[in-house]
Regions:
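Non-catalytic accessory regions of SAM-dependent methyltransferases
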Residues: 1-22
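Non-catalytic substrate-recognition/targeting regions of SAM-dependent transferases
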Residues: 34-111, 119
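Conserved class I S-adenosyl-L-methionine
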Residues: 129-134
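Conserved SAM-binding loop of SAM-dependent methyltransferases across substrates and taxa
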Residues: 140-149
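Conserved SAM-binding motif I beta-strand of class I
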Residues: 152-157
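Mobile active-site "lid"/loop adjacent to the S-adenosyl-L-methionine
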Residues: 162, 201-234
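S-adenosyl-L-methionine
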Residues: 164-199
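Conserved small/polar residues in nucleotide/adenosyl-binding loops
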Residues: 248-252
Length: 252
C-alpha cells in the first residue's frame, strides 16, 4: 500500500489500484463487485481524491515486452512525440521529481516498491565515478546515481519511449550535459559489444524483466531464469576494479 505524492509544480496525491483479471472459476459479477468496493473504500482510507484514483487490470501472461500498454496499439515516434508534449504529473521522492503517466501504460513510470533499491543506488554512487543502468525503464535509478554524485552515467533500454522519458526525468532534476548518455539497444547485445572496448563502470544497476519477446529483439526472447547467468557474467566483465553491481529481480 503506497501513494504517489505530488510536488509543488503538480501538487496532489494519486492512487493506482491494480489487480489480475479473475480466473474463469470466479463469478465475474462477484469480481466486479469486489473491485467496486475497493475503489470506494481505498481513496477514503488513503486520503486520495476520487479523480486521482486509477484502476488497472493485468493479465497473467508471459508474452509481450517488459512494460505493457494500457490500450491496444504499438509505440512509435508519433506516440513518443505526443507523450513528450503532454504535461504529465510530477511526483516527489527522495528530494527528486519524476514524471508519471497514469493513463497510457500498466506501469506509470516509477515502481514505488523499488524506493529502498533507489536509495541504495544513491548511497553506492557516493563512492563511484561512472554509473551504468541496464534495462533502465524511465531512468529513475540514473537520477538517484547522478544525485549521489557520479560524474558520468549511461542509461540503456530497448525502448525509445522510455529513453525519452529517462532523459526528461534527468533534465527535470537538473542533470544535463554530454556526460549523461542514453542508449537504445538490446542489453545483452550491447554488453557483448562493450566487452570489446575499454569502457568500465564503478557502479552498475541491473533491473531485468522476468520475460520479454519484444519484436525489437528479433527472433530472440528473454527469460530471466534462463538468461541471468549470461547477463551477470557479461556485467561482471564491465565492472571497474573494486566496482559494485546491484541486481534487482522480482522473479520468484
Amino acid at each position: 500500500r503506497d501513494r504517489y505524492e505530488g510536488c509543488p509544480q503538480t501538487p496532489g496525491r494519486w492512487l493506482v489500484i491494480a489487480e489480475y483479471a479473475a480466473p474463469k472459476t470466479i463469478d465475474p459479477a462477484l469480481a466486479q463487485a469486489r473491485m467496486l468496493d475497493i475503489l470506494a473504500i481505498a481513496p477514503r482510507i488513503l486520503d486520495v481524491p476520487a479523480e486521482h484514483v486509477h484502476a488497472k487490470a493485468r493479465m497473467r501472461s508471459r508474452g509481450g515486452s517488459q512494460y505493457g500498454k494500457q490500450g491496444a496499439g504499438k509505440s512509435g515516434s508519433g506516440e513518443r512525440a505526443n507523450i513528450a508534449r503532454r504535461r504529465l504529473p510530477l511526483i516527489e521522492e527522495g528530494g527528486l521529481t519524476f514524471a508519471v503517466n497514469f493513463d497510457d501504460y500498466l506501469d506509470v513510470g516509477i515502481f514505488l516498491d523499488h524506493r529502498v533499491t533507489r536509495n541504495l543506488v544513491r548511497e553506492h554512487a557516493k563512492q563511484a565515478r561512472r554509473f551504468l543502468n541496464l534495462f533502465a525503464y524511465t531512468g529513475t535509478a540514473t537520477c538517484y546515481a547522478a544525485d549521489g554524485g557520479v560524474e558520468e552515467t549511461v542509461t540503456v533500454d530497448l525502448s525509445n519511449t522510455y529513453l525519452d522519458w529517462a532523459e526528461r526525468n534527468m533534465r527535470q532534476n537538473g542533470f544535463v550535459g554530454p556526460q549523461h548518455h542514453f542508449v537504445r539497444d538490446d542489453v545483452l547485445v550491447w554488453i557483448r559489444d562493450q566487452r570489446q572496448t575499454r569502457n568500465r563502470w564503478d557502479l552498475i544497476f541491473v533491473d531485468p524483466p522476468t520475460f520479454s519477446n519484444s519484436s525489437k529483439m528479433g527472433r530472440r526472447t528473454w527469460d530471466v531464469q534462463r538468461d541471468h547467468v549470461e547477463l551477470l557474467a557479461g556485467v561482471s566483465r564491465l565492472l571497474a576494479q573494486g566496482g559494485h553491481c546491484l541486481l534487482y529481480t522480482s522473479d520468484a
